[in-house]
Curated annotation (Swiss-Prot):
Protein name: Peptide chain release factor 3
Entry's Gene Ontology cellular component terms: cytosol
InterPro entries listed in its UniProt record: EF-G-like_DII (IPR053905), EFG_III/V (IPR035647), G_TR_CS (IPR031157), P-loop_NTPase (IPR027417), PrfC (IPR004548), RF3_C (IPR032090), RF3_dom_3_sf (IPR038467), RF3_GTP-bd (IPR041732)
Binding of GTP, residues: 18-25, 86-90, 140-143
Pfam families, per database record: EF-G_D2, GTP_EFTU, RF3_C
Domain tr-type G: 9-277
Keywords assigned by UniProt, alphabetized: Cytoplasm, GTP-binding, Nucleotide-binding, Protein biosynthesis
Length: 526
């Protein structure tokens, strides 16, 4: 058992959240560089000579320079073993991002210092609030002209409702960016440009009152001392207990592109972020140091290897230890399975996992039996809770250019819906197929993947659907009557759950008034 505890205590599992273009994929690259996982970091829209960013490994992502799927990367840093989950920054992929946030113990929030708190960041922070996830903040892009740092922190506090404790502080910005002052260590780290792709020694000056500071940065030294007087009086001190409750965020400044300040964030995550936490189930709380293995699936990714049409289920280990060849109990279908070929990840590069501990993410080969939200144990029957499905906000009817490929279309759509890329609805009264998504880009992705992976050419048509709700009723007779009277608005989703497809919000509200015994749910547990 003590061996298990040592491994659990080493783990730090976190995700990076941000508004699109705040620099999240770049920071992922630099974090991996510090973890020795990459020798030279790639940039997303690199020059011809630049490498493609490691975490954007799907063809469509490489073409567009955006992160669409969730990548998982593991690397050692500072005596810890860090699991980084890179989430899609593009606003159209919030469902996938949301589910990823159920698999981590802390988050790194990246903010563009020229723009401040943006809409997508606000939405993602609402999600982290549901589980009081601890948040570390990185104010990025100091190599550009930025807003006043105190204003930035005020905005985070007022808009995101979380106290800010500055750990590092910028000295100048844009062309005048000189470096950062580490408040807790009382040292200035000087900035040099052109070092973004590698790790090199930086010049460090110990002590804010060190005369060497004037020699290095001139009048900025006196400005820094004045600013620090103000900052110390106006901001919160770091409080570890408040951080762990999600009430306070340590704030770091830097530039991911210039690879400056990223090591400070990693130091903070290793020192302060929680080790793997207990997890709720429908029967009890599962502790990470329990002897028996448990885990849950938070994502399914199809076709990670275009050479083999495969699907991989991403599982967060919650307790015990995975060993190659072990027997697991797949709770939902009530079957035992031997797992000898689970995977670990380095963003698309996969290796066979010999062992895994709580906080680790492993991949299980999935031949159509595993769904998002599935629980695996060593025999105990319970279900981990808190992996939700959201009602889509946009709908299209999908049809084929070649009607003979209906079977392939349905297979492709069901697989993509199980993976969480899109939701599929089959109306009870017609042969239509309706696709639901959170944003327009998802529709494009689905058509692209149907063509490249299933050889199916599909096109969309508009459809008068405003929203969808999952419907439940404890009284079987009333549910049957509802089905009979409202069949023109009912459909089955990809998991055969009964769904109400509302043409307008007015229609939905009227139906909710007319059938008070029926529950119309906006979210559904997987």
């Amino acid at each position: 058992m003590s061996g298990n505890k040592v491994e659990v205590d080493k783990r730090r599992t976190f995700a990076i959240i941000s508004h699109p273009d705040a620099g999240k994929t770049t920071i992922t690259e630099k974090v991996l560089l510090f973890g020795n996982a990459l020798q030279k970091a790639g940039t997303v829209k690199g020059k011809k000579s630049g490498q493609h960013a490691k975490s954007d490994w799907m063809e469509m992502e490489k073409d567009r320079g955006i992160s669409i799927t969730t990548s998982v990367m593991q690397f050692p840093y500072g005596g810890a073993l860090v699991n980084l989950l890179d989430t899609p920054g593009h606003e159209d992929f919030s469902e996938d991002t949301y589910r990823t946030l159920t698999a981590v113990d802390s988050c790194l929030m990246v903010i563009d210092s020229a723009k401040g708190v943006e809409e997508r960041t606000i939405k993602l922070m609402e999600v982290t609030r549901l589980r009081d996830t601890p948040i570390v903040t990185f104010m990025n892009k100091l190599d550009r002209d930025i807003r006043d740092p105190i204003d930035l922190m005020d905005e985070v506090e007022s808009v995101l409702n979380i106290a800010c404790a500055p750990i590092t502080w910028p000295i100048g910005s844009g062309k005048e960016f000189k470096g950062i002052y580490h408040i807790l260590r009382d040292e200035v780290v000087l900035y040099q440009g052109g070092m973004g792709h590698t790790i090199q020694e930086r010049r460090v000056i110990k002590g804010i009152n060190n005369p060497d500071l004037e020699k290095a940065i001139g009048s900025y030294a006196a400005d820094l001392r004045d600013e620090m007087e103000l900052v110390r009086g106006a901001s919160h001190e770091f409080d570890h207990a408040a951080f762990l409750k999600g009430e306070l965020t340590p704030v770091f400044f830097g530039t991911a592109l210039g690879n400056f300040g990223v090591d400070h964030i990693l130091d903070g995550i290793v020192e302060w972020a929680p080790k793997p936490l207990p997890r709720e189930s429908d029967t009890r709380v599962i502790m990470p140091d329990e002897e028996k293995f448990t885990g849950f699936v938070f994502k399914i990714q199809a076709n990670m290897d275009p050479k083999h049409r495969d699907r991989v289920a991403f599982m967060r280990v919650c307790s015990g230890r995975y060993e190659q060849g072990m027997k697991m109990h797949h709770v939902r279908i009530g079957k035992d399975v031997n797992v000898s070929d689970a995977l670990t990840f380095m963003a698309g590069d996969r290796e066979r996992a010999e062992e895994a501990y709580p906080g680790d993410i492993i991949g299980l080969h999935n031949h159509g039996t595993i769904r998002i939200g599935d629980t695996f144990t060593q025999g105990e029957k319970f279900r981990f809770t808190g992996v939700p499905n959201f009602a889509p906000e946009m709908f299209r009817r999908i049809r084929l250019r070649d009607p003979l490929k209906q079977k392939q279309l349905l297979k492709g759509l069901v697989q993509l819906s199980e993976e969480g890329a899109v939701q599929v609805f089959r109306p009870i009264d017609t042969n239509d197929l309706i696709v639901g998504a959170v944003g327009v880009l998802q529709f494009e992705v689905v058509v692209g993947r149907l063509k490249s992976e299933y050889n199916v050419e599909a096109i969309y048509e508009g459809i008068s659907v405003s929203t969808a709700r999952w419907v439940y009723c404890k009284d079987e007779r009333k549910l049957e009557e509802f089905r009979r009277k409202c069949s023109q608005n009912l459909a089955l989703d990809g998991g055969d759950n009964l769904t109400y497809i509302a043409p307008t919000m007015v229609n939905l509200n009227l139906s909710m008034e007319r059938y008070p015994d029926i529950e119309f749910a906006k979210t559904r547990e997987h």
